[in-house]
């Protein structure tokens, strides 16, 4: 019997597939990137001509330029608005003509706004350049001006290490801040957000703009009069604590990608307009953009609450899988997956005492088994995670080598690893709100980014974010020498060669940086250097608190530094003059990473700002990348020709094969990220509808029209069938609307659907009018608003859970030759329609049944009011608590789920304020009595 075998889709081989086509097109039309650079160079020439004008100004005159530019912006806006109004009138006239040639034109307000800023750009950039020189003593190079233009125009600017990206961000930030709509400068961690803000804030302050900072659990405003002497770094001493709302109201706000995203979610959970933190999402400049938008692209931000699962099952299955042998399972290292063999299934069934592991009643056992097996076989300690002395399992970022505090693997995997390591298992959690970085950053009106390594991901930036990558030329030519890879037969031979190379350069006095992909390999190299009695500093996620001190000395004469990928990003190793004369920093890569970007980041530590330097990678056939992608074949060939362990080969073909393997992995990851965003786009549409609906209710004082709309929809829905057809007509109707049962029978007996709907709506409207008379219009409006928000929040949380369950099982549809994505879209639409139906019915049921005894909404005291029973009533109806949450990050790339060990009360500010006001007013009432 033949079987249909579905061919596996090959991963996208980015760049390689399009090389020939690109070359042909460039031959005909020229290189578009070069054309862009030439265009920007002309703009810079215009900026340079303005330099003498601003140099001649006094400080006071320079400060006044911001107000003058804002006035100029307003004038240009008025002209643009007038032009837009005329165009709209013209379009309306065209569309009103019933001809075949209807106008398809639309007014692009974003483009119009950017055109206005383009006119101000030369003066704004020249002004910032002069102000920066006066305040910081640094003048923007022409290439930095080009970088600023690229960012303003919504591109990714690739700028090499040491080219001054922090200073470049000043230029577009200032220009776009003139609109008074806010600018967000996004960094990867709290330290960089504070450091960069503290560095640039004096320039913004000099020019009359204020700067805010958003980090985890804190927010600041730059104030030169404020001094916090506890900060050792002078750049951070003037950051004055403030509310989050004040920090977001600043002209320019620095912060981390996590906190910007979390605050967006938190704003869509508040019940009072006053507790909203963010303004509109206008313009974002993302530093290390490849890290945030590519490496963390499949990283949903999650606000979650404990779900209270029993941890005993995790310990039970950790014990079971520890008894399995390699013959009991098949490990797929390429896809990081593991499956049981028939022998393994039989062994597990014996250990569990069951006959059929995969029967329906054992689905929960399969869930625990899968995660325990992955924890045991796929995930390794000191490579994928570390275990602290306090017994906490912390994930290690595979791209940066840093510890990812507050992040947890999802779907029970983190708990399975905790059980494997014998530490306390933390409970699972339920999702309250979530959004991926892909969809969050696409909410911004304009998006741009900068990094040292983006070109290899140019296709993904364009396809997912509509961002073009522009390679900004360095200010000084690169003198670094990148040597060919050395390939060894065994890892031991490779490590001995690394030691010999380190000894050679160390004898000359050159500083050496040895990079590795994991803590395990990092510590293994350290053992080899110990045997050779070579002094070194070691940097990995276990001692990251010493990072600044180690990096500060890494460029000194004779320094040897062993580092994981931590040293590849965000570090700037500066060299003294004597080291430059010796040949600069020597960078040794102890293996190739899955991603070419990570390799390029390591290379980029050497040769900064035109400094000399040498880089070289040492590779063995036993390295993961080589071993997985046919490294054994090469090892056999080397053994056959009699090559010993310590003799390397210089073979460009092997290096090209390695790079091809990297491209295949990158292509696979790209396809995977595209797949994730296709699924995430489905729930993103639901999210946008719900959040828009929620914001309208939150900001609207009177939502009675919305309630009337719900009543009309609900009555039509409930009266489609008569009571003759639907025997549960009366029961279903009374479950939603608390009205006279006899009248419901009359409605159900009517023949025509429109007659049933009309009478039902009249009856329900009368009942609702009676409710309003009972409470009074003002109180009724507050009841409507509070109930609507509470029910919507509860149903949205349930919807997120339902969507997650749907997503987890949808891939099985492919067995029936059905497209899982199409099925997911269809099923999710049904779920969303169910949410809308339940929203109507739950809101109306509560509003028509609530009594004064059940819910005293407000108590007026001297013209003020406070909430009493309403919140309890709504929460009882929804049976959901939204008080204590975890903030963290879920990463589908490596199955991450957030869950910060630190609990955060999402309603803390609101509840504290309410309790305080309530107590004060009660005291007033008692004193009056």
Predicted features and spans:
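Extended, charged helical/alpha-beta scaffold domains that provide interaction surfaces
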Residues: 386, 391-394, 402-407, 609, ...
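Short, Lys/Arg-enriched, disordered terminal segments
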Residues: 1-5, 926-929
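Conserved P-loop NTPase motor core
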Residues: 2-642, 692, 709, 713
């Amino acid at each position: 019997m033949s079987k249909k075998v579905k061919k596996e889709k090959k991963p996208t081989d980015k760049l390689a597939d399009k090389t020939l086509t690109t070359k042909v097109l460039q031959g005909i039309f020229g290189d578009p990137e070069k054309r862009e650079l030439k265009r920007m160079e002309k703009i810079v020439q215009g900026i340079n001509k303005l330099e003498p004008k601003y140099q001649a100004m006094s400080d006071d005159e320079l400060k006044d330029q911001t107000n003058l530019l804002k006035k100029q912006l307003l004038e240009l806006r008025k002209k643009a608005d007038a032009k837009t109004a005329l165009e709209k009138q013209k379009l309306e006239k065209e569309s009103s003509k019933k001809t075949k040639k209807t106008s398809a034109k639309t007014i692009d307000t974003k483009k119009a706004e950017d055109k206005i800023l383009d006119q101000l750009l030369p003066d704004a950039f020249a002004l910032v350049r002069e102000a920066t020189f006066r305040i910081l003593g640094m003048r923007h190079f022409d290439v930095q001006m080009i970088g600023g233009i690229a960012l303003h125009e919504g591109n990714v600017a690739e700028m090499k290490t040491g080219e001054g990206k922090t200073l470049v961000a000043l230029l577009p930030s200032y220009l776009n801040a003139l609109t008074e709509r806010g600018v967000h400068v996004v960094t990867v961690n709290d330290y960089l957000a504070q450091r960069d803000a503290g560095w640039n804030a004096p320039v913004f302050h000099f020019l009359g703009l204020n700067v805010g900072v958003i980090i985890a659990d804190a927010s600041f405003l730059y104030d030169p009069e404020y001094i916090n002497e506890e900060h050792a770094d002078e750049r951070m001493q003037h950051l004055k604590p403030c509310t989050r709302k004040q920090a977001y109201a600043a002209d320019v706000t620095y912060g981390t990608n996590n906190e910007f995203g979390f605050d967006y979610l938190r704003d869509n959970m508040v019940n009072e307009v006053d507790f909203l933190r963010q303004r509109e999402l206008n313009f974002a400049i993302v530093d290390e953009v490849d890290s945030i938008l590519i490496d963390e692209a499949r990283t949903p931000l999650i606000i979650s609450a404990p779900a209270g699962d029993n941890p005993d099952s995790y310990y039970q299955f950790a014990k079971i899988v520890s008894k399995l042998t390699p013959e009991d399972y098949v490990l797929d290292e390429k896809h990081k997956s593991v499956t049981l063999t028939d022998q393994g299934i039989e062994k597990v069934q014996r250990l569990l005492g069951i006959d059929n592991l995969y029967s329906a009643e054992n689905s929960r056992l399969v869930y625990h088994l899968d995660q325990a097996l992955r924890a045991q076989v796929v995930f390794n300690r000191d490579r994928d995670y570390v275990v602290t002395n306090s017994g906490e399992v912390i994930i290690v970022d595979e791209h940066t080598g840093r510890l990812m505090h507050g992040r947890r693997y999802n779907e029970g995997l983190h708990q399975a690893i905790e059980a494997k390591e014998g530490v306390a298992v933390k409970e699972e959690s339920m999702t309250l709100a979530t959004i991926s970085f892909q969809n969050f950053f696409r909410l911004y009106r304009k998006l741009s980014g900068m990094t040292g390594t983006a070109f290899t991901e140019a296709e993904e930036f364009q396809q997912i974010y509509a961002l073009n990558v522009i390679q900004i030329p360095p200010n000084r030519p690169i003198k670094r020498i990148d040597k060919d890879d050395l390939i060894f037969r065994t890892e031991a031979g490779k490590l001995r060669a690394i030691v010999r190379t380190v000894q050679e350069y160390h004898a000359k006095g050159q500083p050496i940086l040895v990079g590795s992909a994991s803590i395990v390999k990092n510590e293994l190299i350290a053992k080899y250097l110990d045997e050779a009695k070579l002094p070194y500093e070691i940097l990995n996620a276990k001692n990251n608190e010493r990072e600044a001190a180690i990096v500060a000395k890494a460029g000194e004469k004779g320094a040897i530094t062993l580092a994981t990928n931590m040293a590849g990003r965000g570090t700037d190793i500066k060299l003294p003059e004597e080291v430059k004369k010796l040949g600069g920093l020597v960078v040794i890569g102890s293996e190739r990473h899955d991603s070419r970007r990570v390799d390029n980041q390591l290379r980029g530590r050497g040769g900064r700002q035109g400094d000399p330097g040498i880089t070289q990678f040492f590779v063995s056939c036993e390295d993961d990348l080589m071993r997985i992608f046919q490294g054994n074949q090469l090892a056999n060939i080397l053994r056959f020709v009699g090559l010993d362990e310590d003799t390397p080969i210089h073979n460009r073909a092997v290096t090209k094969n390695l790079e091809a393997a990297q491209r295949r992995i990158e292509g696979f990851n790209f396809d995977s990220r595209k797949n994730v965003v296709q699924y995430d786009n489905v729930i993103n549409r639901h999210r946008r509808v719900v959040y828009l609906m929620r914001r309208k209710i939150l900001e609207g004082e009177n939502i009675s029209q919305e309630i009337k709309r719900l009543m009309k929809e609900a009555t039509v829905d409930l009266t489609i069938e008569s009571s003759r057809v639907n025997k549960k007509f009366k029961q279903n109707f009374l479950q939603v609307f608390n009205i006279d049962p006899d009248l419901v029978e009359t409605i159900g007996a009517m023949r025509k659907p429109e007659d049933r709907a009309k009478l039902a709506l009249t009856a329900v409207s009368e009942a609702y009018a009676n409710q309003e008379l009972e409470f009074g219009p003002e109180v009724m409006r507050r009841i409507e608003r509070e109930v609507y928000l509470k029910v919507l929040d509860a149903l949205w949380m349930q919807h997120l859970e339902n969507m997650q369950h749907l997503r987890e099982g949808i891939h099985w549809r492919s067995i029936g030759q059905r497209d899982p994505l199409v099925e997911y879209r269809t099923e999710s639409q049904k779920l969303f329609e169910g949410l809308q139906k339940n929203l109507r019915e739950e809101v109306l049921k509560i509003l028509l049944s609530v009594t004064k005894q059940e819910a005293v909404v407000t108590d007026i005291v001297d013209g003020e009011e406070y909430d009493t029973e309403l919140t309890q009533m709504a929460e009882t109806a929804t049976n959901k608590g939204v008080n204590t949450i975890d903030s963290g990050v879920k990463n589908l790339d490596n199955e991450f789920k957030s869950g910060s060990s630190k609990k955060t009360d999402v309603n803390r500010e609101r509840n504290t304020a309410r309790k305080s006001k309530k107590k004060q007013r009660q005291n007033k009432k008692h004193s009056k009595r």
